[in-house]
Amino acid sequence: MASYTVKLITPDGESSIECSDDTYILDAAEEAGLDLPYSCRAGACSTCAGKITAGSVDQSDQSFLDDDQIEAGYVLTCVAYPTSDCTIETHKEEDLY
C-alpha cells in the first residue's frame, strides 16, 4: 500500500495530509481534522468538488462529472484516491457551472 502527500488549498489556507492509495481524500482530510464540504459521499453530486492542479487521482467510482470536467481537472474528493503526490484546490462546486 502506497501513501501520498495531498496538499489541499482551502479558502482558509493550505494543509498537507498523508493519504494512502486505498483511502478517499475526503476521509483522510477529515481524519486530519480538516472540515471540507460534502453531501452524498458517493460521487453522485458536486458538493465536494475540487480542482487538481498537480499530480493524479483515481476517481473511477464517481458518476457526476462529465468527461470535459474531468479533463479540466475537477475531482470529487469523496470518491478520489491519490495515485501520486497531488495538490487540490477545494470548495470548487460553484466553478463547475
Curated annotation (Swiss-Prot):
Residues at which [2Fe-2S] cluster binds: 40, 45, 48, 78
Any single biological process term in GO: electron transport chain
Cofactor(s) needed: [2Fe-2S] cluster
Key words of the record: 2Fe-2S, Disulfide bond, Electron transport, Iron, Iron-sulfur, Metal-binding, Transport
Transmembrane segment boundaries: none
CDD domains noted in UniProt: fer2 (cd00207)
Sequence ranges assigned to domain 2Fe-2S ferredoxin-type in this UniProt record: 4-94
Gene3D superfamilies listed in its UniProt record: 3.10.20.30
Role according to the record: Ferredoxins are iron-sulfur proteins that transfer electrons in a wide variety of metabolic reactions.
Name of the protein in question: Ferredoxin-1
Gene: petF
